[in-house]
């Protein structure tokens, strides 16, 4: 009985299955944590959703910004971009079923026994665990409700970028969504910067990665995140684990076995140059909310 944590899959089903085969994953006994962005950019978003859904309670996942963007495209709010390669999913006979399953997935996972927290982008240094749980529940409640298209239409935007308990309504939901699914850099006071997409060493002062600022989260808890492929899982403090290693860009899909902290990787089956030439986008490009 093992706990496996895997970074952003982005429609790379073959690599996911090969990686799970390396560790003899057994959905009857093991638990699979997924950092979000199951879809877009890779070749098999539809089959990834079908497979992950088929695993039932063996999976603990969170939604990423690309998953939310898919929901917005399906709702007719955002445009379907060819480079995302999600048309087969949108046209699938079980699309309604998959989309309704996806929008009921959480944006935050907390396991008090394992002392694990997982969010796609991380946890803003302005939140403690209880605030993160509260804000995540608010986003999840509206996503799973009949009014979810209203939220999806309002989630695009970078403001507000500073947490306050006084935030309300769609502004509060937008901040929470950005903090949980898009965040990379913060100002020294914890305010989000939603512009810089660079590596930490190339970021302009005074920006710092969210994980390098003093945080309110109980240090007994480890934080698992994806989203930031250019980190390649490196340069993070003890107790922080970045698992997105850019499989859809020609990099690796990375798995961390929690019990012994051992990493396993599966190289992308297509080289980065081939992927980029076929799809016409640059590594690191992301959906803008």
Curated annotation (Swiss-Prot):
InterPro entries: ApaH, Calcineurin-like_PHP_ApaH, Metallo-depent_PP-like. Its EC number is 3.6.1.41. It is an enzyme of class 3 (hydrolase). Keywords: Hydrolase. GO terms for molecular function: bis(5'-nucleosyl)-tetraphosphatase (symmetrical) activity. It comes from the Bacteria. It catalyses: P(1),P(4)-bis(5'-adenosyl) tetraphosphate + H2O = 2 ADP + 2 H(+). Belongs to the Ap4A hydrolase family. Hydrolyzes diadenosine 5',5'''-P1,P4-tetraphosphate to yield ADP. This is Bis(5'-nucleosyl)-tetraphosphatase, symmetrical. It comes from Yersinia pseudotuberculosis serotype IB (strain PB1/+).
